[in-house]
């Protein structure tokens, strides 16, 4: 599968994308709000779970590699995972290498993913969970129309400390109205 934006190709992850996935999960800045450092075997398990052919009626991640059109360079991953079927909800997720940050690729790719999820797949609501303190992720979601729906206090243990999780949501009607 492939989505195309002004500056990016978003392509289904393949076995050849293992080096990118490993770099993302081993970069302390990329992973610092996602998980404590993981073993290579644990990262491989997450990667392998994203390789099967995606189905909107399933429960696995649609994982798309973000590639710059002009260079072909992979700069991150983005996608979503169906949840709460048959109520047509999905959770979005993304991560960019430092070289891909600060260029607007996150917003560009997330808007394409939202368009696909809402208009091609018929999802009613998209959600995101962000660890408190991750202001870049929060800003990205809010710039795409997501609203803060609540805070789960001391919900996630990271670096030996309990952290709050911010819950964000975007209804299909809000996304379509904001295009």
Can you annotate each of these PLM segments?
Residues 1-27, 31, 66-179:
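Acyl-donor (CoA/ACP) binding surface of acyl/acetyltransferases
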């Amino acid at each position: 599968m492939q989505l195309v934006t002004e500056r990016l190709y978003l392509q289904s992850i393949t076995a050849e994308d293992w080096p990118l996935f490993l770099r993302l999960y081993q970069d302390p800045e990329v992973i610092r709000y996602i998980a404590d450092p993981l073993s290579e075997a644990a990262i491989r398990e997450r990667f392998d779970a994203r390789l099967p052919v995606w189905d909107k009626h399933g429960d696995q991640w649609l994982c798309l590699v973000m590639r710059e059109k002009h260079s072909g360079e992979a700069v991150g991953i983005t996608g979503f995972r169906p949840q709460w079927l048959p109520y047509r909800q999905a959770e979005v997720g993304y991560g960019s290498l430092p070289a891909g940050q600060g260029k607007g690729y996150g917003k560009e790719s997330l808007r394409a993913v939202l368009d696909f999820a809402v208009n091609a797949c018929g999802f009613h609501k998209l959600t995101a969970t962000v660890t408190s303190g991750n202001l870049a992720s929060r800003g990205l979601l809010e710039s795409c129309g997501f609203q803060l729906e609540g805070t789960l206090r001391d919900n996630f243990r990271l670096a030996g400390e309990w952290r709050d999780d911010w819950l964000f949501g975007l209804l299909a009607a809000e996304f379509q109205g904001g295009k």
